[in-house]
Amino acid sequence: MTTAPPAAAPAAPAVARPAPRTLTIGGTAYPVFLPSIRDPRLHVASVIITVHVLGQVGLGFWVSVPQILAAILTCAILEVSITFQQSRAFVWPASAMLTGSGVALIMRVVGTPPGQPWSTYAWYVFAVVAGLSLLSKYVIRYKGSHVFNPSNIGLVVAFLVLGSSRAEPLDFWWAPLNVWMLAAYAVITAGGLLITRRLRLLGLAAAFWVTFALALGVLAASGHSMVARWSFAPVTGLDFWRVIVTSPEVLIFLFFMITDPKTVPTGQVGRVAFGVLVAIVSTLLMAPQTDEFGTKVALLSGLVVMCAVRPLLDRLVPEPKSGADDLRRFIRRLSLRTPLRAAAAALVVLALGGGIVLAGTPARGQVFANSSEILGRLPAQVDPSTLPAVTIGQDVADFDPTLASGGMTAVVVTLAQNLEFENQALLRRDGAILLAVDHGDRLLEMQQRLSAVQAGGAVELAHYRFDSIHATLLIPFGKQDGFSIGLQAQGTMVGETYDAAGSRTGQTSGPFNLTFAVRRATGDRWLNVGVLPAPPG
């Protein structure tokens, strides 16, 4: 038995709609479509633009206004041209301008002069990256829609192609918690919550953040270590977890990048699953990274991977808007009431945790070796009383006052010891010693010298006698590596040469004028990271 449908209500009188705006060119009138105040894209734009303003005014972002405009205007011009070609109408390029603004917010070009907001340095790099990001929306498509978030795929490709010496992502850590940072957190969080709630994507964002926090907690607890430009010491443990999980850059990623309505599943269950999987994939990609550049690119790459496999995910989750597409019902179906399901869930969780720990092996214990056991068995061969008093640059004192109040003496003693330990590594043909005192370029250089010695080559030692030392702050060029102390030293270098049998075959002596770069390791150790020519003058 069926019920007859109710009688149709009388039709409401037609409401006259205003005629669309037009622009007449060459005698032809073309429709003009401007944005609506209700358009969520305008709300996202207001948040991103506000962050740009805060970055210029109070947060010291290393990006200039011309660079930002180059990215936004390039995308806008391309989008207007493409849509006009398709529809013979002028459409406000809201999405395109978001793509350009997002690229400019996250990308930094190495060499951009700080504190010069109107610098035109490398503006064309922003234009090219933003333009290619936008074009990806029209080139890489599946079932009538773009596959990747345009700014996300463009940034990942740019960082991988250009490399850390030319381009780098915005730092995880922006500034100390001051009024500017509080304003940035307020704008990003409030705007993000309102927009994602309106788009019904809050569940996706929450699923990502909770899963990401848990997965990153496993990685941090395993002893993961990351070097970063804004920290002298390696970022490990709770500091590593806290900085990244609460990073405003991660909040921008979860509120305004992974929640792109066009690139996420349309169903409720699918969206939550998508957020969980982006968090897991991003953490697995971040795990082996030892510096901030690789960590940030890995985070962004997690979304690229999941967008690429989204068609497969769509097949595994309930049909959107079907009776099964209910998150509570789906969770009940996956309930752990039976021992078999509970055991399977436990195995999955253990496998994921083990995978994260295993993937993080390259960033654990190898970057900064535990040196106490190794160095405790070797002669230091350094008399601190023979070292000169150290003059300290104001940049060092401003960054770490403890170094200006006596801590620099210990740094210089450690440098002198490390240089002698390098000699011991060559004499003893022991690479473990190098891991305890060197890192980065210096480690690679000394390992190459050690390989030559182990192959039967002569042993060349260098003993340094310091006459003067000046400490300054070395800002890494490009790669988001840690700050280093530059010890500009002058004095006399005595060189010794030994043959494969251990007999000394020669000795030289002469002045040196070099800058020794050192970086703080875990604990109170400092590592040699480079030897540079002294600055001119």
Question: What label would you give each PLM region?
Answer:
Residues P362-E373, I475-G537:
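Exposed beta-sheet edge and beta->alpha loop/turn motif
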Residues R341-V413, Q417, F421:
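Juxtamembrane and targeting peptides
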Residues S81-V91, L105-Y124, V139-F148, S164-F172:
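Transmembrane alpha-helix boundary signature
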Residues G27-P31, G55, A76-R88, L132-H146, ...:
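C-terminal ends of transmembrane helices
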Residues T2-Q85, N423:
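N-terminal signal-anchor module of multipass membrane proteins
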Residues W123, P176-L182, G203-A205, W241-S247, ...:
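Loop-to-transmembrane alpha-helix initiation sites
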